[in-house]
Structures are given as structure tokens and as C-alpha cells.
Amino acid sequence: MGWPPPSPYEDGPVPTGKQSPFTALDFQLVLLRRMADHNPGPVEDARRRLGVSLADMREANKRWQAMVRSPRSRPALSRYRSVLGEPESRTPRRIGDLDCEAWRWPVPLWPGLRFEVLTAAAGGAVWNEWLVRAPGAEPPALRTVEDLTPWSCTVDEAARAFAPARPLEGSAPTRWGLAFTAPDASGVRREVVAEFTWGLLQRTEVSGPRP
């Protein structure tokens, strides 16, 4: 054997121990991971379309949670920009006496939706983060309980279609709930509790008829 001995890495890159950058694809896996609690079937289909494994999805979620909880974590808005890039749009809004901005990014997995972050107009704190319908995209026709299928609508769309809707506290930070009445296909009004993850409908509990 000659000297020096051949490097064990001469046929490939030397491992550095560094993780690859967290990408927009990874963020979509984070969205799916929480949705898998209620809809494993659609999530599995979506994961296959993205060409990633179950282990990839779990690892992406693990890395995201570590980023969020780290004492050295960057502010939420900066974190989204680092992962998703510059927003597709920044729209001024006024909610009560507060001036804010809605930042929106495209989500390739759901072309008709956008990921929206609501933040103070001067930047800084993030007040809300969820999926909303993309500008110009056709909204769903929500008329009956049967129209409320998984992933069919956003929180805002359900609240408008079946007003007045009562907000409910979610079971996790990325979950929301709505309680409202809606007719079934026979016209009988039912009590409905709808649960959303990242702003997208996941499941409903229907009881009734309303007294």
C-alpha cells in the first residue's frame, strides 16, 4: 500500500455534518404532517405526488419544530421568508384599530390556495398563519353539509357560507374550529362542528336536526 493511504471519501463528498437547507417542499410536508392526524389517506396521496417518504415528512416536521422552539430561533416572519422566499404579495389591511399586512406565498401542492401570514404593518409579530383561497381562484360551492368534504374549503369560506358561525378553540396551535348550522341534502338543518388545520377543512361532526 502506498503512502499516504487512500481517503475513504475520495469517491464522494466529505460529510460535513450539516443539514441541507429547509425548503418550501419541506414546509409543505410540515403542513401535511399535522393534517395526517385526521386525513391520512389524502395526506399519503399528496406525499406520493411530492415524491417523498413518510420518514421525509416526519423529519421535516421534526426540523421545523426545532426551529420554532429553539431559544435562538429567528422571528416568525423572518423564518417564513428564509424558507419560502419573498412573498408573492403584500397587502395592507386594517383590523379594528390595527394596521397590518397580509403576506402570501404560493403552495404548489394546492395551486388554488396561498399560505397567508398576517403581521403588523411595521413588521415583527405574526398574528395569524394559515391557508386561504388564491386571488382569482374559483371558491367552492358550499350549500349543504355534504359539500363540507376534507380540504374543500378554508375557515373564511365556511364562515361566510354558513353565517353566523361561532369560532371554537382548536386542539393545537395550528387548528381552528367553527360551529354553525347548515342544511343537509334533504333541507334539514343540522348542527355542525368543523375542524380546520392550517386553515383548511379536515373533518366535521354533524348532529341534528336543529331544534
Predicted segments, located by residue:
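Eukaryotic proline-rich, low-complexity intrinsically disordered regions
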Residues: 2-14
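A cross-family detector of function-defining hotspots
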Residues: 11-123, 150, 154-202, 206-211
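A short, surface-exposed helix-loop junction/capping segment
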Residues: 55-62, 133-143
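Short, structured interface segments
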Residues: 117-137
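Mixed-charge, Lys/Arg-rich low-complexity intrinsically disordered regions
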Residues: 144-148
